[in-house]
């Protein structure tokens, strides 16, 4: 059985994936943004391998999340599920970053770099990433007029590019991105066409399945099928330059080569 860490797993797709994996006998480590959210997981607290707490908007707390997970032990897989949707204003994290960038892009990058390397990485993206622009010179929206829909789309482009970059940087790790579809969650709303079980299937499958179809890397998935992502996400120069920029923004360096 595998041990899986899932960010943003107190509700929505993250919680659904956790329940699905627990029901299959796997060990799951949950993540809650606050102690209040963690305390609400009373029905799962005795079943999981751990619950880590920290707000991904904060770089300091993201470092602490990585420390908490590493203290539990190496994960077999990590599902980077946490994300926020459109915000009407740029906002400002404790480090001065745009909220969407911090949670959707910087946090998964930092956790990937700071946590002990797993065998599998799964990054939740969105079909909306195709409407994102690279804009590596202004990732943090300090120069452009704020556009919440564009900021979200860009953040989801970033994680696809990150997944593909890691497939090259760490060839022994299976690194993939997933579009779960517009699912009926607190974020997606009650009118969304995809039920929550279907929405969590692909990322859960990629995290643990030994089927040959799941033992691949550098792919973009939608409902158990590989799809073609935005051309920019597949551009090697864009991937490389994006990672350089993320390292500059966070002060965190992504390790290279084989697992230490």
Task: Pin down the residues of each PLM region.
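Conserved hydrophobic beta-strands of the Rossmann-like cofactor-binding core
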Residues: 3-6, 78-79
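Rossmann-fold cofactor-recognition segment
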Residues: 45-60
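N-terminal Rossmann NAD(P)H-binding glycine-rich loop of SDR-like oxidoreductase domains
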Residues: 10, 18-19
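Conserved Rossmann-fold cofactor-binding substructure of NAD(P)-dependent oxidoreductases
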Residues: 56-74
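Catalytic loop of short-chain dehydrogenase/reductase
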Residues: 83-84, 88-89, 98, 120-172, ...
């Amino acid at each position: 059985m595998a041990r899986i860490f899932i960010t943003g797993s107190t509700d929505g797709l993250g919680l659904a994936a956790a329940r699905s994996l627990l029901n299959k006998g796997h060990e799951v480590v949950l993540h809650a943004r606050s102690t209040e959210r963690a305390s609400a997981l009373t029905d799962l607290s005795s079943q999981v391998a751990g619950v880590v707490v920290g707000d991904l908007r904060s770089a300091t707390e993201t470092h602490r999340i990585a420390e908490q997970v590493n203290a539990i032990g190496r994960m077999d897989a990590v599902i980077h599920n946490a994300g926020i949707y459109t915000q009407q204003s740029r906002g400002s994290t404790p480090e001065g970053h745009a909220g969407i960038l911090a949670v959707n892009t910087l946090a998964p990058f930092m956790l990937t770099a700071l946590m002990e390397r797993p065998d599998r990485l799964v990054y939740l993206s969105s079909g909306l990433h195709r409407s994102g622009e690279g804009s590596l010179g202004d990732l943090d929206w300090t120069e452009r007029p704020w556009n919440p829909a564009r900021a979200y789309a860009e953040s989801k482009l970033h994680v696809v590019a990150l997944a593909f970059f890691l497939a090259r940087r760490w060839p022994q790790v299976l690194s993939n991105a997933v579009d779960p579809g517009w699912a009926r969650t607190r974020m997606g709303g009650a009118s969304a066409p995809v039920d929550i079980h279907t929405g969590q299937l692909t990322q859960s499958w990629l995290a643990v399945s030994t089927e040959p179809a799941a033992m691949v890397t550098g792919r973009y998935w939608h409902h158990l099928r590989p799809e073609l992502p935005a051309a920019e996400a597949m551009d090697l120069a864009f991937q490389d330059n994006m990672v350089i920029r993320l390292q500059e923004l966070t002060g965190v360096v992504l390790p290279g080569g084989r697992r230490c």
